[in-house]
């Protein structure tokens, strides 16, 4: 028989524990033996795995909940602007990342255990594109009088400049090239990143008051010593612009063997309009996919001469060559099988549709060089992988004909002029706060720390900006949390909606549930814990198909000269519908299950004038019998039976 509410009031405190009760009983499955439990529900915010998997550290659950209408803005702010503000707290490039990020967040999505992941990228693109269409802008913080030099105008540099201006610090960006954007402009083709959208997201940052000095190389046009005199701190966001060559015989010194970055930059800056007749690219990541996809689009024209000529100088092809181009052959080789390649699955599928030949499980052995000193082919063989080491399969050797061989197997830094900052890998060493090791006042972010994703560079820039702020304000560097992301803050939300708790009056109390100076029975563990799918009530969720973006992927007969954007955005209705597929892991999404199924009517909705995101329900502990049905039926894993432990 369950303990009566009157006996519970008499025998227990509000926390529902007994003196000497230190054993954590496993009550899972014992919901009909409720009188055994002295535990009552507590509300726990945890990080969803999408956010835990996001290198930029975005509050993904937060802006999905805004788009779907669960979390609402105050005043007359639109849903679109509110979602934009939440997304750009971490990432000032939602339109770009919604298009080209390989989306590790989607791989980590708990919805994969129900039907299919939430199309996070597609909703992010909707947020970013809508912000551009509506002219949403950023506000700079109140001036601190501090100045920061940002070396590099790519994703890391511009993201850092954005965060620094929000903090009130002056930021000057030094960029070696003629335009800002880094890899987003010079490494990724325009049919994946529309240049007008890129310009809009860059200009929005510049309009915060960021000073820009293009065509300026630090170490050549301005010295490090001068930077240290003129600025209070320096952030190095150089990127990695030196492509790695193939470590096989015949590569070094062969003119028509080039790296993928050289190839893509020549195309993206408008110099290269046609290429070779037979292109072979070695890689398996997104860069290699871009190389072969570009080659298929621009094609071949014999009148252009040797394909490497335009890559090894600063000349520009005449447009007439492109107008008379014919299709070329493009082959991509990868050590890994297709299911293990680093490129996004849809990029591999699209490239195949466009007529690219993909040879997976193949390793390069030798560049075949002709009598004229140019490569005529690439000798390869089948292989298997032992970890990251290829193991050749004997008897499978063959030669792939080629008049241009492109290596897209990684990249390194160009530290000429700033060699004092280089490590033995020609990168820059950083500590956990992205300070340059043994260089006070110098910080670093992006590929020059470790070549990785655009979203990784953006995430590092955010952490580096926080560290710079601490340095400039003479504050102790904060210890980075285990789950180092941008998190929803209930305390900030309460302030936003006018429900800020009262100041603590230091008077005795029967319990915090009776007072308004505390957020009672809530614990934010988002900086320490990621919630797994097995903590959710998955039976709550119906199977719902993803809302897919329309793609303009040409086939092999249509690809020549096809430069239309590949990925169309979702309309508002589809974006909202896709956001509604989010399971809001680790945060209440106001389903009412706990209220409906509580047999004691102990769980109740908070009054509307006191309710907000994360404070939708509460518990009357004088009625709770510890049956933990509320926790069992909570779809999002927001309820733990923790009170009384």
Briefly describe each language-model feature range.
Residues 255-279, 367, 386-453, 459:
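FAD-site-proximal beta/loop scaffold in flavoenzymes
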Residues 26-27, 49-51, 58-75, 113, ...:
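Beta1-alpha1 glycine-rich phosphate/pyrophosphate-binding loop at the start
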Residues 142, 147-149, 199-248, 366-379, ...:
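Feature captures the FAD/FMN-dependent oxidoreductase FAD-binding
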Residues 33-53, 84-103, 135-151, 185-186, ...:
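Ferredoxin-like iron-sulfur electron-transfer modules
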């Amino acid at each position: 028989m369950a303990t009566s509410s009157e006996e519970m009031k008499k025998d227990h405190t509000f926390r529902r524990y007994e003196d000497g009760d230190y054993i954590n009983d496993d009550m899972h499955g014992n919901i009909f033996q409720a009188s055994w439990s002295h535990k009552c529900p507590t509300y726990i915010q945890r990080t969803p795995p999408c956010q835990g998997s996001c290198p930029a550290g975005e509050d993904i659950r937060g802006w999905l909940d805004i788009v779907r209408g669960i979390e609402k803005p105050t005043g007359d702010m639109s849903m679109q602007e509110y979602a934009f503000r939440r997304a750009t707290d971490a990432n000032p490039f939602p339109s770009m990342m919604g298009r080209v990020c390989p989306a590790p967040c989607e791989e980590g999505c708990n919805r994969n255990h129900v039907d299919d992941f939430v199309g996070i990228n597609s909703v992010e693109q909707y947020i970013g594109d809508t912000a551009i269409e509506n002219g949403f802008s950023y506000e700079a913080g109140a001036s601190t009088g501090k100045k920061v030099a940002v070396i590099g105008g790519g994703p890391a540099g511009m993201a850092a400049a954005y965060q620094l201006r929000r903090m009130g610090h002056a930021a000057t960006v030094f960029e070696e090239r003629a335009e800002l954007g880094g890899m987003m402009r010079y490494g990724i083709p325009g049919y994946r990143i529309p240049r007008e959208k890129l310009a809009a997201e860059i200009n929005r940052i510049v309009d915060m008051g960021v000073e820009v000095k293009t065509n300026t190389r630090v170490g050549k046009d301005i010295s490090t010593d001068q930077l240290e005199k003129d600025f209070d701190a320096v952030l190095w966001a150089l990127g990695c612009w030196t492509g790695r060559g193939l470590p096989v015989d015949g590569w070094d010194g062969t003119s028509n063997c080039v790296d993928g970055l050289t190839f893509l930059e020549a195309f993206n800056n408008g110099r290269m309009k046609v290429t070779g007749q037979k292109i072979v690219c070695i890689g398996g990541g997104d860069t290699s996919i871009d190389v072969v996809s570009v080659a298929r689009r621009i094609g071949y024209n014999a009148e252009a001469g040797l394909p490497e000529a335009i890559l090894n100088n600063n000349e520009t092809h005449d447009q007439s060559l492109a107008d008379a181009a014919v299709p070329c052959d493009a082959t991509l080789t990868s050590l890994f099988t297709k299911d293990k390649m680093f490129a996004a699955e849809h990029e591999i599928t699209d490239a195949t549709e466009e007529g690219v030949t993909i040879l997976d499980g193949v390793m390069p052995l030798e560049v075949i060089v002709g009598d004229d000193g140019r490569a005529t082919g690439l000798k390869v063989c089948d292989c298997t992988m032992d970890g990251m080491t290829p193991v050749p399969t004997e008897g499978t050797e063959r030669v792939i004909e080629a008049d241009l061989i492109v290596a897209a197997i990684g990249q390194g830094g160009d530290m000429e002029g700033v060699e004092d900052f280089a490590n033995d890998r020609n990168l820059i060493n950083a500590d956990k706060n992205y300070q340059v090791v043994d260089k006070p006042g110098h910080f670093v972010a992006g590929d020059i720390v470790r070549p990785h994703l655009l979203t990784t560079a953006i995430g590092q820039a955010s952490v580096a900006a926080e560290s710079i702020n601490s340095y400039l304000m003479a504050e102790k560097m904060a210890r980075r949390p285990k789950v180092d992301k941008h998190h929803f803050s209930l305390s900030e939300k309460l302030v936003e909606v006018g429900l800020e708790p009262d100041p603590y009056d230091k008077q005795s109390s029967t319990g915090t549930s009776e007072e308004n100076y505390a957020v009672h029975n809530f614990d934010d563990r988002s900086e320490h814990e990621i919630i797994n799918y097995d903590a959710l009530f998955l039976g709550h969720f119906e199977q719902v198909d993803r809302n897919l973006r329309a793609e303009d992927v040409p086939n092999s007969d249509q690809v020549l000269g096809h430069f239309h954007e590949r990925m169309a955005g979702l309309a508002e209705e589809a974006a909202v519908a896709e956001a509604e597929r989010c399971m809001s892991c680790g945060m209440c999404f106001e389903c009412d299950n706990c209220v409906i199924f509580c047999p004691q009517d102990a769980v109740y909705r908070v009054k509307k004038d006191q309710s907000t995101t994360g404070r939708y329900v509460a518990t009357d502990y004088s009625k709770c019998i510890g049956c933990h049905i509320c926790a069992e039926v909570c779809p999002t894993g927001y309820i733990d039976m923790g009170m009384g432990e």
